């Protein structure tokens, strides 16, 4: 029996089983694509997970080219945005209080 894997036809090979809802979550990486017809093996999913965890450095992966500084700069931008919003809310509250005192 010939099986097609990734565009290649393998002669005398058993066709890999497709993941389905009936296969359950714990078998052969079925949690990745339950019912969607995605073929996943435990070895392949482990290799992908290992490649993601052993990447060089810590980065956000946003394509910004910031490398390890990405999380630091995004954190600083978040703090600056939060400080701006707090100041803006205090200013609005002060204007409302001043208008209430004037009447």
From Swiss-Prot:
Record-annotated membrane-spanning stretches: 28-48, 60-80
Keywords recorded for this protein, A-Z: Biomineralization, Magnetosome, Membrane, Transmembrane, Transmembrane helix
Record GO cellular component, one term: magnetosome membrane
Disulfide bonding pattern of the chain: none
Disrupted gene: phenotype observed: Deletion of the probable mamGFDC operon leads to a slight reduction in magnetic response and slightly narrower magnetite crystals.
Keyword Nucleotide-binding: no
Membrane topology: Multi-pass membrane protein
Stretches in topological domain Cytoplasmic: 1-27, 81-103
Localization annotation: Magnetosome membrane
Spans annotated as LG repeat: 60-67
Ranges per topology, Lumenal: 49-59
Protein family per UniProt: Belongs to the magnetosome MamG (TC 9.B.95) protein family.
Free-text function comment from the UniProt entry: Plays a role in regulating magnetite crystal size.
Other information: This bacteria makes up to 20 cubo-octahedral magnetosomes of about 45 nm in diameter which contain membrane-bound crystals of magnetite (Fe(3)O(4)).
Name the UniProt record assigns to this protein: Magnetosome protein MamG
Origin species: Paramagnetospirillum magneticum (strain ATCC 700264 / AMB-1) (Magnetospirillum magneticum)
């Amino acid at each position: 029996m010939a099986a097609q894997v990734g565009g290649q036809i393998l002669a005398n090979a058993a066709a890999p089983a497709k993941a389905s809802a009936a296969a359950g979550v714990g078998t052969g990486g079925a949690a990745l694509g339950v019912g969607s017809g995605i073929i996943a093996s435990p070895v392949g999913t482990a290799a992908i997970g290992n490649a993601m965890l052993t990447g060089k450095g810590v980065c956000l992966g946003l394509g910004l080219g910031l490398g390890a500084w990405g999380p630091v700069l995004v954190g600083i931008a978040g703090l600056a945005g939060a400080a701006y919003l707090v100041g803006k809310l205090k200013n609005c509250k002060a204007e409302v209080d001043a208008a209430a005192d004037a009447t």
